[in-house]
Amino acid sequence: MADTIQEAVTLALDDAPERNFRETVDIAINLRDLDLNDPSNRIDESVVLPAGTGQETQIVVFAEGETAVRAQEVADQVLDSDDLEDLGDDDDRAKDLADETDFFVAEANLMQDIGRYLGTVLGPRGKMPTPLQPDDDIVDTVNRMKNTVQLRSRDRRTFHTRVGAEDMGPDAISDNIDVIIRRLEASLEKGPLNIDGIYVKTTMGPAKEVPV
């Protein structure tokens, strides 16, 4: 499968019109034979890409004490319980934060307050924080999430995810796609039989089918 993925990626990169900006590379995934009105059939998976995402990933950490101090080294923002309460009183600011942030991480003891103050904002966006367990290292967790993408179908048969940037080259992008396909197949009831098609493209380029 790796060779056919690489062929599709190479075609997508070669056929993309030259632009004066750095294009991202995405895949579109089409599902079939699934009742996506049933939430249990929907895809919602975090996947760590072996070659990275090729872009900055915005991560916000809710933490206090030593964890907050260490998180300052790697996170884009570190917020404490007072900040959390302030966000709960400012719906516009909370929505802006949710829209600008790729992933949230929170100490487990703050999750209840996050649900109370931000649940109605983060929940519908699929951005409730990943709970940080007592033995988890915040620096390792954030660094791993910087290379993470979210596969999220919601109730749609077609959904998209980022797999890299054009200047990463076919090998790295193909490795990322291979990992995503394997995770996707493992998540689907009938594996590859539930996949109707996968297409790879740059931001402005033509889509090329990835054989599965």
UniProtKB/Swiss-Prot annotation:
PROSITE patterns to which the protein is assigned, alphabetical: RIBOSOMAL_L1
A GO cellular-component term linked to this record: large ribosomal subunit
Annotated keywords: Repressor, Ribonucleoprotein, Ribosomal protein, RNA-binding, rRNA-binding, Translation regulation, tRNA-binding
Annotated signal peptide: none
GO biological-process terms attached to the record: regulation of translation; translation
Subunit structure: Part of the 50S ribosomal subunit.
Family: Belongs to the universal ribosomal protein uL1 family.
Protein's job: Binds directly to 23S rRNA. Probably involved in E site tRNA release.
Protein name: Large ribosomal subunit protein uL1
Organism: Halorubrum lacusprofundi (strain ATCC 49239 / DSM 5036 / JCM 8891 / ACAM 34)
Taxonomic placement: Archaea, Methanobacteriati, Methanobacteriota, Stenosarchaea group, Halobacteria
